[in-house]
């Protein structure tokens, strides 16, 4: 296995209530489980003092990028990918609904693929969401599979491991700044010939999550945009 050198990237929007606990837990784990690491928080124009809290409480222990205005999860992660200094990047949601220890399952597959994605819906995965969110998520996943990229149980899981050079290659072609960036990147990975592994993980439901019903409508619009971009030839041609 390669050395465990990792950027752990948290996109954050109005996460002042829980970001400190997330970072404390992640730092404690990283100190004992990684050879080299950096924790990177990209504040996406928060209005609740998230960035100030991170800077004041963690100082040099955590790298902080402040975006002046909200651009969307995809835009925030792109900023983090551009700034990452380690050869692998783990994307994780700021609520740590997927325990950081689940990284071990992804890392075990890193020798076989430059992209390893966690999956709440794959056989062996655990999804502790309310029934309505499970239903809407499953419906959306079917639409994504039929319209953009197939073969995955869960494109939207926020826990993903990318080799940094591959992530940067994909983000050069990224056009979606919202939640749809997840399946856009996987579609690009397929077109550019990068292997992707999907690993079942355990996802806990955290109160106060930031995904609203409106977000599902936004994702629907992003699916339409990606289909339009494909028709207009705005993505790289698929490699044979």
Regions found by a protein language model. Name each.
Residues 5-7, 38, 184:
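Cell-envelope/extracellular polymer assembly enzymes that use nucleotide-activated donors
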Residues 15-30:
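Short, well-formed alpha-helical segments that are part of the catalytic scaffolds
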Residues 15-18, 46, 73, 99:
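Donor nucleotide-sugar binding loop of glycosyltransferases
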Residues 36-40, 51-83:
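Conserved donor nucleotide-binding strand/loop of the catalytic core
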Residues 43-51, 96:
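A conserved acidic beta->alpha catalytic loop
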Residues 67-83, 88, 100-179, 206-215, ...:
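Acceptor/aglycone-binding surface of glycosyltransferases and processive sugar-polymer synthases
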Residues 151, 175-177, 186-203:
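Catalytic donor-sugar/metal-binding loop of nucleotide-sugar-dependent glycosyltransferases
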């Amino acid at each position: 296995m390669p050395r465990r050198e990792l950027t752990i990237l948290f996109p954050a929007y109005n996460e002042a209530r829980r970001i400190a606990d997330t970072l404390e837990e992640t730092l404690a784990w990283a100190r004992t489980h990684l050879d080299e690491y950096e924790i990177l928080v990209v504040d996406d124009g928060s209005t609740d003092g998230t960035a100030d809290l991170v800077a004041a409480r963690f100082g040099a222990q955590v790298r902080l990028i402040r975006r002046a205005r909200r651009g969307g999860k995809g835009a925030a992660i792109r900023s983090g990918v551009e700034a990452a200094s380690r050869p692998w990047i783990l994307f994780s949601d700021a609520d740590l609904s997927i325990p950081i220890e689940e990284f071990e399952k992804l890392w075990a597959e890193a020798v076989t693929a430059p992209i390893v994605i966690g999956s709440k819906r794959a056989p062996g995965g655990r999804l502790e969401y309310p029934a309505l969110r499970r239903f809407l998520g499953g419906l959306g996943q079917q639409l994504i599979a039929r319209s953009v990229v197939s073969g995955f149980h869960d494109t939207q899981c926020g826990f993903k491991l990318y080799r940094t050079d591959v992530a940067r290659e994909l983000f050069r072609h990224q056009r979606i700044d919202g939640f749809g960036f997840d399946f856009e990147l996987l579609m690009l990975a397929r077109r550019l010939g990068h292997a992707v592994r999907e690993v079942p993980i355990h996802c806990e439901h955290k109160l106060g999550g930031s995904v609203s019903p409106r977000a599902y409508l936004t994702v629907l619009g992003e699916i339409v945009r990606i289909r339009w971009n494909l028709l207009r030839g705005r993505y790289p041609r698929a490699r044979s």
